[in-house]
Amino acid sequence: MIKSGFITIIGRPNVGKSTLLNSIMGEKLSIVSCKPQTTRNSIQTILTRDDFQLIFVDTPGIHKPKHKLGNYMVKVAESSVKDVDLILFLITPDVEVGKGDRYILEQLKKENIPVFLVVNKIDENPQEKVAQTLKNYSEIFDFAEIIPISALKQKNVKELVELMVKYMPEGPKYYPDDMITDKQEKFVVSEIIREKALRLLSKEVPHGIAVDILSMKKNSKGLYNIEATILCEKESHKGIIIGKKGAMLKKISTYAREDIEKFLDSKVYLEVWVKVKKEWRDSDRLLKELGYK
């Protein structure tokens, strides 16, 4: 028997949930962007060592839904706090305790699950601000541990992992040693492309994009041929994504290919198109096809 269990990361949009998960794993498995609510699926990632296995559930930021996709994202976030062994409540020092935070913490009091207060981005805020934030939150909830970190610079991340292991029950290895995610390769590839698009595009094209992997085949020489379509909701968005003389689409494809090659540990030929699908975020059929339901 080893130490093994399930952990969920929750918090406001854009507090660094995906960055923290990637920092812990050393792999870019969860989409990272400067835009809120960029994580859509509850991605399970697995960190395995000789004496422990931690299974992370990365959730969308809990927010007021505006469409069916938003409803799905909130449902995933709320369901992810059930049946786990530990909850990481992630915050940043620059944001005051709000009604939403109090609501979530009130719900967590009912769960009888240990909760860590993880304060991210401490390198971007004065020590006095960090200390005050810790005090404010500790007054409204009895956290099992309080850990200030910088996920981006990996400050105190190793110490956080050690503390998480300490709180895990004894159990089996739920996944093979070499498995780092329970999602199919296609899903991770689509998320990489979507991340690059979100990172490079302006605010004119917010969350109204998805990536559909049309084909993903490996030839006899070990080269992956991948065909993908970026779906957007408006013709004007299509033009922005493609860019002048195709420059933006080429940039998205190039950056995505580099990360996909690292993930697959193989050379990749990537071809990406752009297609308009009006109101795809409210289409049950499309959401199901894209793996969001």
Swiss-Prot record:
Residues 37-41 are annotated as: G2. Residues 201-278 form the KH type-2 domain. Signal peptide: none annotated. Coiled coil: none annotated. It is a peripheral membrane protein. It is found in: Cytoplasm; Cell membrane. GTP binds at residues 11-18, 58-62, 120-123. Pfam families: KH_2, MMR_HSR1. One of its GO terms (biological process) is ribosomal small subunit assembly. Residues 11-18 are annotated as: G1. Monomer. This is GTPase Era. It comes from Clostridium kluyveri (strain ATCC 8527 / DSM 555 / NBRC 12016 / NCIMB 10680 / K1). The gene is era.
